[in-house]
Design a protein with these regions (language model features):
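Terminal peptide-recognition signature
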Residues: 147, 171-174, 203, 231, ...
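PDZ/PDZ-like domain segments forming the peptide/carboxylate-binding groove
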Residues: 133-176, 180-183, 289-294, 315
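Conserved mixed alpha/beta catalytic, RNA-binding, or beta-rich assembly cores of soluble enzyme
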Residues: 93-98, 102, 108-128, 139-140, ...
Length: 354
């Protein structure tokens, strides 16, 4: 299973290649040793640990399954070269004791308590759902951050509305609320939450190319009783540009930075990588801020194995990144999207990124 959500690595390294296997009484067959439950029962024999290690990397400038990983249409794009690889952490769980010992002894994986992957109050399905939502959010933020960096207009668009909610329609562009401009979804959420359930607000919307005012009721949220409108909104390019992301079976927010750089590279005449193999990680917010992630040492290891010569790491992950083995890979510290683009330009010019 590949995950992207931040997880705190176990404080003590579990890597000691000298294992005294004679201290472990081995009395069962190899088949029995690999069992994770007693046959014919629901008794779980798996250890309460997961193994974390380097996962696969994906070139956000490349293709997967015959599709561009980052696919842009509706506007002029420019040729790219090289690599901007997002990196992953591979997580294995549901292991028997011998399987866990084998991974501990023969790989660079680290064992972490299973609760760090699947909290006690959440099922694997719930965690996976959260990871998928975080991944989708990273895609949306990547689009917003890239378009803002390139000074291209964005719009808050209605994606869906409750049944019977006829005041607002799918495809409406929300320009303002009660006369105040809406620049991003958070602006609308904040404005609505300043009202009480049952109030009415006036939205300034653009529908079929025409602006109009629409009065809508403030509803009560189902999960936290907070005031809401009940509509699903998304920030999209306002100039007809469409940006789609094509990676399946990946979860979590840490692909955001590399997705954003791919969008910027494809929409910029200048080739940002100059054919070089760059990898990295980091969350991205809609304003271009880069946030920390989990498993950075594993991701650097994955990048090295893939052939990267530079790795972009969030500033908050620098201490861990520097403490590990990164020989042959230049580390670039980034706080925001502008830092990341600057680092690419410095490497292109033959300089070492700051």
């Amino acid at each position: 299973m590949l995950v992207w959500h931040p997880v705190r690595l176990i404080a003590v390294s579990l890597r000691n290649k000298t294992i005294i296997l004679g201290a472990i009484p081995v009395v069962a067959s190899a088949v029995a040793l690999s069992l994770t439950e007693i046959p014919g029962t629901s008794v779980d024999l798996s250890v309460p640990y997961a193994a974390e290690g380097p996962g696969p990397t994906f070139n956000t400038l490349g293709t997967t399954g015959g599709k561009n990983v980052v696919d842009i249409s509706g506007t002029k794009t420019y040729p790219t070269s090289g690599h901007l690889n997002m990196t992953t952490v591979s997580v294995r769980h549901g292991m028997s004791l011998p399987q866990a010992i084998t991974r501990w002894a023969t790989t660079n994986d680290m064992l972490v308590p299973i609760e760090q992957i699947f909290p006690a109050n959440q099922s694997p399905e719930e965690v996976n759902k959260e990871n998928q939502a975080a991944f989708a959010s990273s895609e949306n933020n990547a689009t917003s951050a890239a378009m803002k960096y390139l000074h291209r207009p964005m719009a808050v668009t209605v994606m869906s509305q409750p049944e019977g909610f006829d005041e607002i329609r799918k495809g409406d562009i929300i320009e303002g609320i009660d006369g105040k401009k809406i620049a991003q979804p958070q602006d609308l959420v904040k404005a609505v939450r300043s009202h009480k359930v049952g109030d009415r607000v006036t939205l300034q919307v653009q529908r079929d190319g025409k602006s109009q005012d629409v009065s809508v009721p403030v509803r009560q949220g189902e999960s936290d009783d907070a005031p809401i409108l009940g509509i699903t909104i998304k920030q999209e390019p306002a100039d007809g540009t469409t940006i789609d992301y094509h990676l399946d079976d990946i979860g979590g927010p840490s692909a955001g930075l590399m997705f954003t750089l791919a969008v910027v590279d494809k929409l910029t005449p200048e080739d940002l990588t100059d054919g070089k193999f760059i990898a990295g990680t980091g969350t991205i917010d809609a304003d271009g801020g880069v946030g920390p992630i989990g498993g950075v040492s594993h991701k650097i290891d994955a990048a090295k194995k893939a052939g990267a010569t530079m790795f972009m790491t969030p500033s908050d992950n620098c201490a861990e990144a520097m403490s590990g083995d990164h020989d042959g890979v230049v580390l670039a510290k980034v706080n925001n999207l502008s830092d990341a683009v600057t680092a690419l330009k410095e490497v292109k010019a033959g300089k070492e990124p700051k």
